[in-house]
C-alpha cells in the first residue's frame, strides 16, 4: 500500500450547495471518521514521524462531521454527537497548538472547549459571511 499525506494549502475550495461536503448529516458520514481512524493507526505504526500531519487529518475529519451535526435539529440527541464532541474537546488544546490548522480553526477548538453553543454561533456566523462572498 502507498499513502500520501499533504497538508499544504495549494488551492482554495469553492463549496457548491448540496454537494457531498455541503449536504446535511447522515449516519453514513461517520464513515469519514472511521476511515481516517484506520488510516491514522496505519500511519502511526509505519510512519510515526508524520504524527502531527496525521493528527491534523484525523481531527479535521472530526471537525467536518461535527460541523454537519450542528446543522441538525436536536443534534445533542444524536449518538454521533457525543463521540465527536468528546474527541474535539479532549484534543482542543492539542489542536490549538498544531500549526497545520489555520488560525481560525485553532481558535474554534478553544471556543468549543469553552462552550458548544459559542462554537456553533461562530461557525454559523462564519458560514453566513462566506455565503455573502460567493
PLM regions: where:
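Membrane-interface aromatic/basic loop that binds lipid-linked glycans or pyrophosphate carriers
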Residues: 45, 71-134
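Amphipathic alpha-helical repeat scaffolds of TPR domains
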Residues: 55-68
Amino acid at each position: 500500500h502507498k499513502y500520501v499525506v499533504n497538508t499544504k494549502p495549494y488551492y482554495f475550495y469553492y463549496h457548491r450547495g448540496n454537494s457531498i461536503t455541503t449536504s446535511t448529516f447522515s449516519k453514513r458520514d461517520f464513515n469519514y471518521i472511521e476511515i481516517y481512524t484506520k488510516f491514522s493507526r496505519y500511519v502511526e505504526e509505519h510512519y510515526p514521524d508524520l504524527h502531527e500531519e496525521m493528527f491534523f487529518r484525523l481531527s479535521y475529519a472530526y471537525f467536518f462531521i461535527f460541523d454537519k451535526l450542528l446543522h441538525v435539529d436536536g443534534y445533542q440527541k444524536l449518538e454521533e454527537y457525543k463521540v465527536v464532541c468528546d474527541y474535539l474537546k479532549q484534543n482542543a488544546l492539542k489542536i490549538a497548538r498544531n500549526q497545520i490548522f489555520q488560525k481560525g480553526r485553532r481558535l474554534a477548538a478553544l471556543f468549543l472547549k469553552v462552550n458548544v453553543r459559542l462554537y456553533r454561533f461562530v461557525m454559523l456566523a462564519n458560514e453566513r459571511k462566506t455565503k455573502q462572498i460567493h
